[in-house]
Amino acid sequence: ILNKKIWGVYEHHPLHNKLPIIRGFDDKFYVPHSRNTGVDGEAIRKNKELTIVAESDETGPYIILNSTGSQVFVTGHPEYDPDTLDKEYHRDLAKGGDCVMPKNYYKNDDVNDEILVKWRSHAYLLFSNWLNYYVYQNTPYNLDDLLKMKTTNK
């Protein structure tokens, strides 16, 4: 558990440009985060079964793959709608207490200004790559073959 909540829209960068999961990603891309827990990047790096594919200097590992590519772990929220962090911010304000505005989210860091949606194209590309390269292309046409694959991989 972190001392301070990570939330806002953060810059990320790919670490392994040749992997299909990040095909087409920009050198820098943005992803929303909203969490009170950290991710131990050093522990992940020491695990030979896992690879950090993309990360942020501020939030740590973002996309992590297992060695076979059958598991993809994403620590941010690329699926967020444009107003998700705004709703969360106003909800937390209504509860009272110490509430900090989400980072890099509102234009000019002004809650009354527009929301800057910088993650949409990245989100579509991430989900498209995952479905195409890790689900569709790895699922056999004959579903009986899929059952055989599952029983032999145990």
Segments predicted by a language model, with ranges:
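Amide-donor transfer/coupling interface in amidating biosynthetic enzymes
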Residues: 7-154
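Catalytic nucleophile loop
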Residues: 1
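Catalytic helix-loop patch of NAD(P)-dependent Rossmann-fold dehydrogenases
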Residues: 4
